[in-house]
From Swiss-Prot:
Gene name as annotated: pth
Record site: Discriminates between blocked and unblocked aminoacyl-tRNA: 9
Full protein name: Peptidyl-tRNA hydrolase
Residues annotated to bind tRNA: 14, 65, 67, 113
Locations listed in the record: Cytoplasm
Main localisation: cytoplasm
Keywords: Cytoplasm, Hydrolase, RNA-binding, tRNA-binding
Family annotation (Pfam families): Pept_tRNA_hydro (PF01195)
Molecular-function annotations in GO: peptidyl-tRNA hydrolase activity; tRNA binding
Active site positions, chain numbering: 19 (proton acceptor)
Organism: Rickettsia akari (strain Hartford)
Reactions this protein catalyses: an N-acyl-L-alpha-aminoacyl-tRNA + H2O = an N-acyl-L-amino acid + a tRNA + H(+)
Assembly and oligomerization: Monomer.
Site positions per UniProt: Stabilizes the basic form of H active site to accept a proton: 92
Entry's Gene Ontology BP terms: protein quality control for misfolded or incompletely synthesized proteins; rescue of stalled ribosome
Length: 185
């Protein structure tokens, strides 16, 4: 069993923001497995479940705001008794240019409030799929930048990155993490 978490903020006003790239990605991945989300209030998230090649996959989108994402992660992790090594978090990263993706296990949170929240409840020994959204230009405030919609040209480039994750996601299910890491760059 694996748990895949897409980070973002709830609400239509945030749907296409840079900070919601995790939600955008997880929706496309779940769709690939013909799995749809439903709200589970007891877990503070939207959840979708499927089985692929005998392995259960649980997808979640926290319904809390980003800085409280750990609340839903710990609820689902505890209920399903999931080892942190089987947890994959997809999130935005301003230290990577748009369209760049990096995969890593463990490590720091890079100042990302969603990761800080998750680290606070399960530690940091889980997998991260970091999706680049670039840095703000012209001294724009970081929070303002992340909570604004992608420019159309950026969105198209970001979707190319998401497609690389979706098209290679089976490698995660096969526990070929190094191969996944190399294919998504």
């Amino acid at each position: 069993m694996i748990l895949v978490i897409g980070l973002g903020n709830p609400g239509k006003e945030y749907q296409y923001t840079r900070h919601n790239i995790g939600f955008i990605a997880i929706e496309k991945i779940a769709n690939q497995y013909n799995s749809s989300f439903s709200t589970k209030k007891q877990f503070n998230c939207e959840i979708a479940e499927t089985i692929s090649d005998g392995q259960k996959i649980i997808f979640i989108k926290p319904t809390t705001y980003m800085n409280l994402s750990g609340k839903s992660v710990i609820s689902v992790k505890t209920y399903y008794n999931i080892n942190p090594a089987k947890i994959f978090v997809i999130h935005d990263d301003i230290d990577l240019e748009t369209c760049r993706i990096k995969f890593k296990t463990g490590g720091g949170n890079g100042g990302h409030n969603g990761l800080k929240s998750i680290d606070g409840v399960i530690g940091n020994n889980y997998n991260r799929i970091r999706v680049g959204v670039g840095r703000p230009k012209n001294n724009q405030d970081v929070a303002d930048y992340l909570l604004n919609n992608f420019l159309q040209s950026e969105y198209e480039i970001a979707m190319q990155a998401i497609d690389r994750i979706v098209n290679n996601f089976d490698l995660i299910l096969e526990n070929k993490l190094e191969k996944f890491k190399n294919k998504i760059v």
